[in-house]
């Protein structure tokens, strides 16, 4: 059990409400949920000893599929050769499926304890435990047994899902299950109302053959999440009865309409499990007369800057949203990017489509242009300061990356012009703790740059993207790099140990072997976007925000395994019908987003995030 990440009980107060059906569909939906970055490994433990249904639900004949013993314990029965869904049930141990189980409580308890102690699940993401009706020995035994082997887990059981039908006779018994969980301090993830209507197999209309809404009413009474209502779908029943090796449940289930319902139910359950936050609009920073291209938060001072195609930059007080100053009149074309120098006074680098970069500083009560950087032959697309404010990087449509050093008396010295990209360079970003620069381009590549003492050289090139790299952002600890592209993909990269072998690259910059580094693709975020991702922002080392052309803000996170990310929250139409070009986090965990509507929205996370 030590390699089981999450344990969820599925409970019902009364038999015949379709609890095993719900368990089966939760397992199938979790396995392929789009809210994770990969297919999940699922285990299903059937502790309904006298009436085990899980083998039949998955089409695994209990007389031909048997439990095997290995040196590390009992091996689950897997639904296919991928071994991504494993099953454990007493039915796999009985000599005949017609055998009755006439056991007293102590023998039942011993069997359940053996399931907990002897089954080798391997590394699985979720273990769903299908329980018998009521609150009896089996329920107490599974909880006590899990406690004895999972004492190091921060939470004994991650939660329980309640299954009921709409009728009062069913919801009455579920109330007892709720009390059971509350007495044992088991979190209740929510209620599923099963058999909520009947779907006609001919016209697909849904008719209420029982009462409706009992499960939702129960949720409201006990202030529990209502996960969703599931109608009786004859097509699902037909699939269960007709499945075979040639027509496995796992392949055909996803084509059913009920599968779409369970994807939503599964996401609601995950939201409850992870205390998923929602974005709530706090205030709006306005005043620009064109789209906002960039928003930047000062690292230490309560200042926010927004840059717009109206050729201006507006500076706001971060907490109140009060307009402090408007910087305009210098640039002759759209201002594409703005960046605060990470020092304890207000200094801004402003990049423009007029091919120049201006440096503004607040001196006394006014904002003055203290330097102008020229040299790019075309639009400057991005500007970024190094972690200590010593270096400034700029990139342009002219395919080049320039590195400047900030000198005394507001002077800037151009240290390098990097011309290895073959197309428009869209973005540059610095490592938060090291003098490492990355750049992303219309040529679909990400390139890494370091100072080798004589010149700035390319130390790594990543070519996994198949479209324009629009966004790059390092995690606050510098361990991970996120990249977003023109096809809506977001990649997560992690640095490997540097390779001391001699570098072989066609680059004009000669690379010393000791500087060569390798970054490995660790994850692709859950596929949320189909249009370009323009902007990325880390809330913390484990939580990343992404947005772009679709106008949806996505919040994603991982727990312990950096290769496994899940969707935390989605905010659709965050700027109505407009694209979002930029996001940034404030020091008090508010999110800023700037869009084509010319507005900078300030979002607060719901309180639930504080316990996630």
Swiss-Prot record:
This protein's record includes keyword Repeat: yes
Its job: Fusion protein of two essential components of the cytosolic iron-sulfur (Fe/S) protein assembly (CIA) machinery. Required for maturation of extramitochondrial Fe-S proteins. May form a heterotetramer with nubp35, functioning as a Fe-S scaffold complex, mediating the de novo assembly of an Fe-S cluster and its transfer to target apoproteins.
Taxon lineage: Eukaryota, Fungi, Dikarya, Ascomycota, Taphrinomycotina
Annotated protein name in UniProt: Probable cytosolic Fe-S cluster assembly factor SJAG_02895
Cofactor(s) recorded in Swiss-Prot or TrEMBL: [4Fe-4S] cluster
GO cellular component: cytosol; cytosolic [4Fe-4S] assembly targeting complex; nucleus
Residues the entry annotates as binding ATP: 13-20
InterPro entries: CIAO1/Cia1, Mrp-like_CS, Mrp/NBP35_ATP-bd, NUBP2/Cfd1_eukaryotes, P-loop_NTPase, WD40/YVTN_repeat-like_dom_sf, WD40_repeat_dom_sf, WD40_rpt
Assembly and oligomerization: Heterotetramer of 2 nbp35 and 2 SJAG_02895 chains.
Protein family according to the UniProt entry: In the N-terminal section; belongs to the Mrp/NBP35 ATP-binding proteins family. NUBP2/CFD1 subfamily. In the C-terminal section; belongs to the WD repeat CIA1 family.
Extra information: Results from a fusion of two genes coding for two proteins which both play a role in assembly of Fe-S clusters in other species (CFD1 and CIA1 in S.cerevisiae).
Note on how the cofactor is bound: Binds 4 [4Fe-4S] clusters per heterotetramer. Contains two stable clusters in the N-termini of nbp35 and two labile, bridging clusters between subunits of the nbp35-SJAG_02895 heterotetramer.
Organism: Schizosaccharomyces japonicus (strain yFS275 / FY16936)
GO MF terms, alphabetically ordered: 4 iron, 4 sulfur cluster binding; ATP binding; ATP-dependent FeS chaperone activity; iron-sulfur cluster binding; metal ion binding
HAMAP family documented for this protein: ciao1 (MF_03037), Mrp_NBP35 (MF_02040), NUBP2 (MF_03039)
GO biological-process terms attached to the record: iron-sulfur cluster assembly
Keyword Disulfide bond: no
Binding site for [4Fe-4S] cluster: 200, 203
């Amino acid at each position: 059990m030590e390699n089981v990440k999450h344990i969820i009980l599925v409970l019902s107060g009364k038999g015949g409400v379709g609890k095993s059906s719900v368990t089966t569909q939760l397992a199938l939906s979790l396995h392929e949920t789009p809210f994770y970055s990969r297919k999940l490994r699922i285990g299903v433990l059937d502790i309904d000893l006298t009436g085990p249904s899980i083998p039949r639900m998955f089409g695994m004949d209990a007389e031909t599929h048997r439990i095997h013993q290995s040196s590390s314990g009992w091996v689950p029965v897997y639904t296919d050769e991928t071994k991504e869904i494993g099953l454990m049930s007493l039915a796999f141990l009985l000599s005949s499926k017609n055998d009755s189980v006439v056991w007293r409580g102590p023998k039942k308890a011993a069997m359940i304890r053996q399931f907990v102690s002897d089954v080798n699940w391997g590394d699985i993401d979720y273990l769903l435990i299908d329980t018998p009706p009521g609150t009896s020995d089996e329920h107490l035994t599974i909880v006590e047994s899990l406690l004895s082997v999972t004492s190091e887990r921060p939470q004994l059981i991650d939660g329980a899902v309640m299954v009921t039908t709409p009728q009062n006779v069913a919801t009455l018994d579920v109330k007892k299950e709720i009390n059971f969980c509350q007495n044992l301090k088991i979190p209740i993830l929510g209620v599923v109302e099963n058999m909520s209507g009947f779907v006609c197999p001919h016209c697909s209309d849904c008719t209420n053959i029982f009462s409706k809404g009992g499960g939702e009413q129960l949720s409201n009474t006990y202030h529990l999440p209502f996960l969703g209502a599931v109608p009786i779908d004859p097509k699902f029943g037909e699939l269960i009865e007709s499945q075979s090796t040639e027509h496995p449940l796992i392949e055909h289930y996803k084509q059913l309409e009920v599968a779409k319902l369970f994807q939503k139910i599964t996401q609601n359950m995950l939201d409850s499990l992870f205390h998923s936050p929602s974005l709530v609009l706090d205030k709006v920073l306005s005043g620009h007369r064109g789209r906002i291209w960039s928003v930047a938060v000062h690292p230490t001072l309560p200042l926010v800057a927004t840059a717009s195609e109206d050729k201006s930059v507006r500076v706001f007080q971060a907490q109140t949203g009060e307009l402090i100053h408007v910087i305009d009149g210098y640039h002759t074309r759209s201002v594409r990017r703005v960046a605060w120098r990470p020092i304890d006074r207000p200094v801004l680098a402003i990049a423009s489509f007029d091919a120049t970069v201006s440096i503004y500083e607040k001196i006394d009560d006014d904002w003055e242009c203290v330097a102008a950087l020229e040299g790019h032959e075309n639009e400057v697309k991005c500007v970024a300061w190094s972690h200590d404010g010593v270096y400034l990087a700029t990139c342009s449509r002219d395919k080049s990356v320039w590195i400047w050093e900030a000198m005394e008396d507001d002077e800037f010295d151009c240290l390098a012009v990097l011309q290895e990209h073959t197309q428009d360079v869209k973005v540059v970003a610095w490592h938060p703790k090291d003098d490492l620069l990355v750049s992303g381009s219309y040529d679909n590549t990400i390139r890494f740059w370091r100072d080798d003492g004589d010149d700035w050289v390319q130390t790594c090139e990543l070519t996994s993207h198949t479209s324009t790299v629009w966004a790059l952002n390092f995690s606050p600890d510098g361990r991970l790099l996120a990249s977003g592209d023109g096809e809506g993909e977001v990649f997560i990269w992690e640095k490997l140990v540097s390779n001391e072998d001699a570098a072989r690259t066609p680059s004009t910059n000669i690379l010393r072997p000791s500087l060569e580094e390798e970054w490995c693709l660790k994850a692709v975020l859950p596929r949320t976007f189909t249009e370009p991702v323009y902007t990325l922002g880390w809330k913390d080392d484990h939580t990343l925000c992404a947005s772009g052309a679709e106008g949806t803000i996505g919040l994603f996170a991982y727990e312990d395994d950096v290769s496994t990310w899940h969707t935390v929250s989605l905010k659709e139409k965050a700027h109505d019908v407009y694209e979002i070009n930029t996001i940034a986090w404030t020091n008090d965990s508010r999110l800023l987003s700037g869009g084509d509507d010319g507005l900078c929205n300030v979002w607060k996370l719901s309180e639930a995030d504080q316990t996630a």
